[in-house]
C-alpha cells in the first residue's frame, strides 16, 4: 500500500481526497474530512488542493447557516453564490462571507435585490416559509428572484435534515423549484432529493431523486404564490409516499428474497446451546 501511495502524485492524491469529501453522507463531512486528512497527511495540500470540494459539498447539500447578526438561517446554494467566497441572503438583503470548512457566515453587508422581481420573490417566500414550517420540523427555505436570460425567474430551495449519529443514521431532504414570470401560464420545474445513511451493524445508503414538471397559472403575486405552493405540496407529498411504499415493498419482497430473516425451520438458532452441547459431548468422549 505504501508503494502505491509513493507512486501517486500530489494532484492524484488531492483528486481522490476531493472525491471522498464531495460524496460524504449528510452530517458526516467532519468525519470524512478527518479520515482523509489522516490518509493524506499533508494539511496544506488538503486545504489548498481540495478547497473546491469543500465548496461544492456545501453548495450541493444546501448547507444551512446562520449569518452573523441575524436569527434565521439561509441556504448555501449556487443561486446565492456571488463569487470570491461570498453569498447572498435575499430575505435579509445582505451578502456575507462563508468559510466552507468551518461553515461560518461572517461580514454581512447590505445587498439590495432586483427591484423588478422583488415583489414576486417576497410573495413566494412568504407562502413557502409557511409551507415549510408546516411540513418540515427542521426545514429551511431560501427564495431567490433573478433575471436569467432576460426572464424574471423565481427559484425556491428547501432543506431539511436529521442527524442522529448516536443512533447511527443521518438524512437530508433537498428540493429546488423554479419558474419564470410570464403572462397567463408558465412551467414549473422541480427536483426532489433524499439521501439517508444508516450504519449500525452495516452500511446502507438511500440516494434518490425525482424531476418534476407542471404548469402554473400566473395572475397576481399573492395568488400565483398560493398556486405554486399547491404544486410543490402535491409533488412532495406524492414523492414521500412513493418512497415509503417502495421501501416497504422492498422490505417485504426483495430483501426477503435475498436473505431469510429466519432459517428454513422458522426458528432462530441458539448458538450458545449448540456450543454447550458440543463441549459436553467432547467432555464425555474424553
UniProtKB/Swiss-Prot annotation:
Name the gene. Answer: CAPZA2
The UniProt entry's GO biological process terms, in alphabetical order, are: actin cytoskeleton organization; barbed-end actin filament capping
Task: Tell me what organism the protein belongs to.
Answer: Ornithorhynchus anatinus (Duckbill platypus)
Any one Gene Ontology cellular component term annotated for this protein:
brush border
Q: Name one Pfam family in it.
A: F-actin_cap_A
Q: Record's InterPro entries?
A: CapZ_alpha, CapZ_alpha/beta, CapZ_alpha/beta_2, CapZ_alpha_1, F-actin_cap_asu_CS
Q: What is this protein called?
A: F-actin-capping protein subunit alpha-2
The family annotation for this protein states: Belongs to the F-actin-capping protein alpha subunit family.
SUPFAM superfamilies documented for this protein: Subunits of heterodimeric actin filament capping protein Capz
Q: How does it assemble?
A: Component of the F-actin capping complex, composed of a heterodimer of an alpha and a beta subunit. Component of the WASH complex, composed of F-actin-capping protein subunit alpha (CAPZA1, CAPZA2 or CAPZA3), F-actin-capping protein subunit beta (CAPZB), WASHC1, WASHC2, WASHC3, WASHC4 and WASHC5. Interacts with RCSD1/CAPZIP.
An example molecular function term from Gene Ontology annotations: actin filament binding
Q: Give the sites modified to Phosphoserine.
A: 9
Function field: F-actin-capping proteins bind in a Ca(2+)-independent manner to the fast growing ends of actin filaments (barbed end) thereby blocking the exchange of subunits at these ends. Unlike other capping proteins (such as gelsolin and severin), these proteins do not sever actin filaments.
Q: Which residues carry this modification: N-acetylalanine?
A: 2
Give the keywords, sorted.
Answer: Acetylation, Actin capping, Actin-binding, Phosphoprotein
Q: What is the lineage of its organism?
A: Eukaryota, Metazoa, Chordata, Craniata, Vertebrata
Amino acid at each position: 500500500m505504501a508503494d502505491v501511495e509513493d507512486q501517486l502524485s500530489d494532484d492524484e492524491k488531492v483528486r481522490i481526497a476531493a472525491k471522498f469529501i464531495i460524496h460524504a453522507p449528510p452530517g458526516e463531512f467532519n468525519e470524512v474530512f478527518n479520515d482523509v486528512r489522516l490518509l493524506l497527511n499533508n494539511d496544506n495540500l488538503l486545504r489548498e488542493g481540495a478547497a473546491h470540494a469543500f465548496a461544492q459539498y456545501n453548495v450541493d447539500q444546501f448547507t444551512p447557516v446562520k449569518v452573523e447578526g441575524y436569527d434565521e438561517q439561509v441556504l448555501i446554494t449556487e443561486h446565492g453564490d456571488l463569487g470570491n467566497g461570498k453569498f447572498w441572503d435575499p430575505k435579509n438583503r445582505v451578502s456575507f462571507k462563508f468559510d466552507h470548512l468551518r461553515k461560518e457566515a461572517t461580514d454581512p453587508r447590505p445587498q439590495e435585490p432586483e427591484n423588478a422581481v422583488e415583489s414576486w420573490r417576497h410573495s413566494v417566500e412568504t407562502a413557502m416559509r409557511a409551507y415549510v414550517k408546516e411540513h418540515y420540523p427542521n426545514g429551511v427555505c431560501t427564495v431567490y428572484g433573478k433575471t436569467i436570460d432576460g426572464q424574471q425567474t423565481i427559484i425556491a430551495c428547501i432543506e431539511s435534515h436529521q442527524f442522529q449519529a448516536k443512533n447511527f443514521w443521518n438524512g437530508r431532504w433537498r428540493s429546488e423549484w423554479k419558474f419564470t414570470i410570464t403572462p397567463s401560464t408558465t412551467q414549473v420545474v422541480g427536483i426532489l432529493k433524499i439521501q439517508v445513511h444508516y450504519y449500525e451493524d452495516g452500511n446502507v445508503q438511500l440516494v434518490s431523486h425525482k424531476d418534476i414538471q407542471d404548469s402554473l397559472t400566473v395572475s397576481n403575486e399573492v395568488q400565483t404564490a398560493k398556486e405554486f405552493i399547491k404544486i410543490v405540496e402535491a409533488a412532495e407529498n406524492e414523492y414521500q409516499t412513493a418512497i415509503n411504499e417502495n421501501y416497504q415493498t422492498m422490505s417485504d419482497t426483495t430483501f426477503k428474497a435475498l436473505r431469510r430473516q429466519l432459517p428454513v425451520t422458522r426458528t432462530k438458532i441458539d448458538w450458545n446451546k449448540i456450543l454447550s452441547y458440543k463441549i459436553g459431548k467432547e467432555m464425555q468422549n474424553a
